Amino acid sequence: MNDNPANAEPQEEEVSLESQPSTPESGSDGSKEAELEAKIKELEDSYLRVHADFENTKKRLEREKFQALEYAYEKIAKDLLPIVDTLEIALKSANEVSGEESELQAKFKEGLELTLDNFSKVLQRHGIEMIACEGEFDPHLHECIMQVPSPSHQEGEIVQVFQKGYRYKERVLRPAMVSIAKSN
């Protein structure tokens, strides 16, 4: 539209400037590309860490769920142990009665024995077992409430059991209360 040659030259210069990429801009494109690649790498690394954390948490929760199910009887078993103790004490008292036993006393004692026997079988059926209290003292299974001199026992050996201990699978529900021999 403009036939003026003075106006035509600057337009050509502008076109020539636009068509030739400048060196600083191409360097910034390269640095932008490097920045973007670094950001992508950082985000990929972050994603992998979050994913690994998620997988670890998932595995931990599965393990805890399995343990909770596996040890579900533990709480009720702890609550039942005093009942077993009471039955054992009652049976011991019934056995210590001196004099002639009446038929009623004999039936009562027999009932206590059967109840205690059934209770013990139920506990065993559900994986609850009594802790053995013979021989050497084990601090993981026994609780020493006193040390006594005993010429018939070696030092550290269990002399007397005051309260039976129980365990459920690998966990100790209640340690056995014992006395152990001490050196003379």
From Swiss-Prot:
Q: Spell out the coiled coil positions from the record.
A: none
Q: Name one GO cellular component term.
A: cytosol
Enumerate the GO terms in the molecular function aspect. Answer: adenyl-nucleotide exchange factor activity; protein homodimerization activity; protein-folding chaperone binding; unfolded protein binding
Record's InterPro entries? GrpE, GrpE_coiled_coil, GrpE_head
Where are the residues of the annotated region Disordered?
A: 1-35
Where in or outside the cell is it found?
Cytoplasm
First and last residue of the signal peptide: none
Instruction: Check the record and name the SUPFAM superfamilies matching this protein.
Output: Coiled-coil domain of nucleotide exchange factor GrpE, Head domain of nucleotide exchange factor GrpE
CDD domains the record matches: GrpE
Q: Which family does it belong to?
A: Belongs to the GrpE family.
The job of this chain, per UniProt, is described as: Participates actively in the response to hyperosmotic and heat shock by preventing the aggregation of stress-denatured proteins, in association with DnaK and GrpE. It is the nucleotide exchange factor for DnaK and may function as a thermosensor. Unfolded proteins bind initially to DnaJ; upon interaction with the DnaJ-bound protein, DnaK hydrolyzes its bound ATP, resulting in the formation of a stable complex. GrpE releases ADP from DnaK; ATP binding to DnaK triggers the release of the substrate protein, thus completing the reaction cycle.
Give the quaternary structure: Homodimer.
State what protein this is by name: Protein GrpE
Task: Specify the species.
Answer: Wolinella succinogenes (strain ATCC 29543 / DSM 1740 / CCUG 13145 / JCM 31913 / LMG 7466 / NCTC 11488 / FDC 602W)
Q: Which gene encodes it?
A: grpE
